[in-house]
Amino acid sequence: MLRLLRFSINQWDQEVFELNPSPDPKAIWQTVLATAYQEYTAAKNSDRSHRDGVVVTPVEIVDFQVRALKDSLAAQGATLADPRVEILDPFGGTGIYCARIMQLSGLTPDELDDLYHYRLRMIEIDPIACQIADANLKTVFEEETGRPPRRSIVICTNTFTIPTGMEKPHV
């Protein structure tokens, strides 16, 4: 896997610096993580990769979605700090979407703590992706708040088989 990661980093560096001489290192790291996982999955089990559609959503698209979410909330007089806002990523992969929400939220550490522990969840069926996402999201949370998270927000299950009422983890 290290070999794939090294290839991904070199390939990404070349492409990113051609497009943007001063890229966001947090965005680069999310892309490297997701691309390495995608390449690992394709190399390990190409049938699964094609069947299940293991594809990385580019960080630029995720960032657009996060900005659109924030704009939509602002138009309704709310922010990501609003306790009525709950976010569920049903096909979380390596956690890019939740990570970028935390990184782009503009929330205080206390507001981000509340969002992370009580209103932000991610579901993924692949146990390896769940482990990567869990480590990724815990690291991002600690970088953004300066404190370690109290629990995981990653749920390892099939999104299509969740019984009603089970989409919220018990705290």
What are these regions (language model features)?
Residues M1-V171:
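SAM-dependent methyltransferase catalytic region
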